[in-house]
Amino acid sequence: MGTPPGLQTDCEALLSRFQETDSVRFEAFTELWRNMKFGTIFCGRMRNLEKNMFTKEALALAWRYFLPPYTFQIRVGALYLLYGLYNTQLCQPKQKIRVALKDWDEVLKFQQDLVNAQHFDAAYIFRKLRLDRAFHFTAMPKLLSYRMKKKIHRAEVTEEFKDPSDRVMKLITSDVLEEMLNVHDHYQNMKRVISVDKSKPDKALSLIKDDFFDNIKNIVLEHQQWHKDRKNPSLKSKINDGEEKMEGNSQETERCERAESLAKIKSKAFSVVIQASKSRRHRQVKLDSSDCDSASGQGQVKATRKKEKKERLKPAGRKMSFRNKGNVQNIHKEDKPLSLSMPVITEEENESLSGTEFTASKKKRKH
């Protein structure tokens, strides 16, 4: 959806009338707002979808005049227009003002200019919008989508509201500076002619400073450089980064020199080694040998203690009888999974079985 017909014309008419007042006060803007009945711009039979789209377009149009290259007065009027449109809209919830992140730095600079110029009514309006969370921060100024058009329509800048690039340079050109220099030289020569001493003019005739032209020239050059830095802040940041790098390199060289001096001092200190006397060496060796003996003795004691613990923890199976061993083996066999092999009968079991069969046959005979 494009800009609704008549909306841009009405906004420009309101801003042009505000420009004619030659003021940035909020009272002057509200008077024009009431006279034009601008609050009824959202009235009419519209569905919710159309209402939301119309409000978005109105806020986007007003935001366009809030950014450069428009004059300071037009930007203040656009701020008041945004405030009025945001608070008189009929959408629920309210549509927010779409702000691209790349434009936010310029907005903060404008806020600081308002505070420095003591335009507190405009600064209050901007702060009120921020507190009401009227801004919707986005990556791009417009909502992007897939388009088949090769050429994208760009908004035209209104020349009436546009801020001149540099008024100082238009006023003081190179021709004007040259003419001022000629006038200044002629003035100095005339003072010498009138004065008694032809080499030096009288002090009574020195109504202006001798370096008047040089001061004007330096001021113009400083203003020109400031204007360039304002247009291209990246160049200024690069210059500052270069200065910081130079300072960092100088600090690194100082650190390297300190480190080298400390290394030299340490090398000198450790190069001179104090040798101990023979008696001390002998004592030291003895002490080392005693330490080794004590360490070996402690190791042997630990080994014997470990052996004793192992002997204590040995199972009492050695004291068990042969039958108990058999029972233990049978218990372990029961724990194991069943196998399909035939059972193995030992000799002792054969003897016991034969004995039981013999006694059983004797009892039968007795009966």
UniProtKB/Swiss-Prot annotation:
Signal peptide: none annotated. The keyword tRNA-binding does not apply. GO terms for molecular function: sequence-specific DNA binding. The keyword Transmembrane helix does not apply. Residues 164-268 are annotated as: SNAPC4-binding. Residues 292-301 have a biased composition (Polar residues). Residues 228-254, 278-367 are annotated as: Disordered. Residues 1-168 are annotated as: SNAPC3-binding. It is found in: Nucleus. Residues 238-254 have a biased composition (Basic and acidic residues). The modification Phosphoserine is found at residues 289-290. One of its GO terms (biological process) is snRNA transcription by RNA polymerase III. Keywords: DNA-binding, Nucleus, Phosphoprotein, Transcription, Transcription regulation. InterPro entries: SNAPC1. Its main location: nucleus. GO terms for cellular component: nucleolus; nucleoplasm; snRNA-activating protein complex. Part of the SNAPc complex required for the transcription of both RNA polymerase II and III small-nuclear RNA genes. Binds to the proximal sequence element (PSE), a non-TATA-box basal promoter element common to these 2 types of genes. Recruits TBP and BRF2 to the U6 snRNA TATA box. Part of the SNAPc complex composed of 5 subunits: SNAPC1, SNAPC2, SNAPC3, SNAPC4 and SNAPC5. SNAPC1 interacts with SNAPC3, SNAPC4 and TBP. This is snRNA-activating protein complex subunit 1. It comes from Macaca fascicularis. The gene is SNAPC1.
